[in-house]
Amino acid sequence: MPHLEPLPEAKDQIFDAVDNNWVDVHAPIWSRPFLKLSRMDRPIGTWLLLLPCWWGLLIGILNTGSPKLNDLWIFVGCAVGAVLMRGSGCTWNDINDRKIDAKVARTKLRPIPSGSVSVKKAAFWMVAQALMALFILLTFNTTAIILGFIAILPVAIYPFAKRFTWWPQFFLGIAFNWGVLLAFAASTNFLTWPCIILYLAGISWTLFYDTIYAHQDKEDDALVGVKSTAILLADSTKSWLFISLL
């Protein structure tokens, strides 16, 4: 039987990316570092940002009694906006975490710490994505636009949260579930308590899944001095996660 050598991995392939993802296989080589900054090779995060938007839109439609043509645009606009804002947010995160990422096994091959993209180019890419998302936001009503601008605050704070609190996942939850409020307001032009309660439930959901995700980095995180719920809760994680679902 002939000896078969394993296929070499692309030297810039990110450790936590899916094998043979469309970015590594189909995207033009020049675009790959930028697409990876936006996590286009790992779409699960986009879904985690988009689903709360669609939840908010759904209860907004139920609140008004029937869907309107504008709700279809909100549905589509939220989908495109989730891709763009996740990309812009991840780029912002990587710009600020570049020194930490260089010391963590899972993240050291990301575009900025690996040298594939300069900080200046990453900043331009972040702004470009944010401006495209802004164009979509400005097609919504005034209440949604105001909420969209308020969302900049938790997005801006999140990369620094792991430096000053054991609960950075809470800040991620605030940012990632903001779409519940925004999409509901885009459909109804106001907010209600059921919408706010759903938003709070979404934050709890994010605490659940991102604490699990953080466990893969907890040894490296402890060494470089950053905080997370995975480190804080340690062996008690399962009990706390169960409580978060109640």
Question: Which residues does each predicted region cover?
Answer:
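Small-residue-rich segments of transmembrane alpha-helices in multi-pass membrane proteins
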Residues: 47-57, 111, 171-187, 232-235, ...
